[in-house]
């Protein structure tokens, strides 16, 4: 370990859950030394070397975890789809709602009509509850514009959120989310627009950190998604994929072929899909909120992910139609209750594995020397409580890049 003699701040008095290697890796009565926005020393307080700290912060017990990471959201959108919630309760399926002009397309209409400022104000309202829970990094997708102007508008709003609030925002271009109304019956023509116009322009303006697509019978075929991925490769952007949510189309295998950083949903993933993901290093992002709201019965193949050592991340999937979820902690409980994940796996899913799903694992997701000083101090005695309680105690303190977040 590099010798440290000075630091900007020294934090101690709580147990530290580092999440190194995907495990709790508890440091009882730990200490963290920070210079700038980085951790320069971490370990048991009793082993702290002589360090001169410009400032000291003493916690009175509790737990410190890495800052939470919500690695899959659709937080920027216009309109309201609470009426669809009532329809689904009355037995109307997601596919039927979409076929009747609802679903994603109704949000597309509202998003296209909204100004950039209106979208920003609505997204700020949705983002603040996640910040209050200790989220320090979030991914936000486009996908409700479905034309060049509106997709860029959404991505600009997402970038702006990261400028206005103390949170890291990663943006994803999801132009291949649904078929826009002006291209009904012409999916290949729309994919031409995505590949030849939207993705190149988004890359030129540096508005996206990745490209995503929705591979499903009510969205785009594997062949169409492959074209999107090739365009992303040409633009120098990594890829992700909504795959195997409602049916088995081998989208996860396609994602693995392109070394996608993540494949998401995965309720219908097969063993061969999981094997391909394991070989490619693709993270499985599980979305229990959508599973719950859609009353799905096919669980993602958790045991296969364990068997083949595919990292499992969790996310809110915050969106207006299938997962109106503004609580990442609720997803921890749902993952344990619905998917039979362990509390330790669930916490890894919103820290180290979520970081990997965004390609930021070198700087975030665990508490260790050299990484960003992003953490949450909880008034709890055991990390399993984060998944155990439904609602309840919010963080006592959130530290973002070495400073207490207001």
Swiss-Prot record:
Binds 1 zinc or iron ion per subunit. Fe(3+) binds at residues 72, 74, 242, 317. The keyword Metal-binding applies. Zn(2+) binds at residues 72, 74, 242, 317. One of its GO terms (cellular component) is cytoplasm. GO terms for molecular function: imidazolonepropionase activity; iron ion binding; zinc ion binding. It catalyses: 4-imidazolone-5-propanoate + H2O = N-formimidoyl-L-glutamate. The keyword Zinc applies. It is an enzyme of class 3 (hydrolase). Keywords: Cytoplasm, Histidine metabolism, Hydrolase, Iron, Metal-binding, Zinc. Its main location: cytoplasm. It holds the Pfam family Amidohydro_1. GO terms for biological process: L-histidine catabolic process to glutamate and formamide; L-histidine catabolic process to glutamate and formate. Transmembrane segments: none annotated. Pathway: Amino-acid degradation; L-histidine degradation into L-glutamate; N-formimidoyl-L-glutamate from L-histidine: step 3/3. Its EC number is 3.5.2.7. NCBIfam families: hutI. Belongs to the metallo-dependent hydrolases superfamily. HutI family. This is Imidazolonepropionase. It comes from Yersinia pseudotuberculosis serotype O:1b (strain IP 31758).
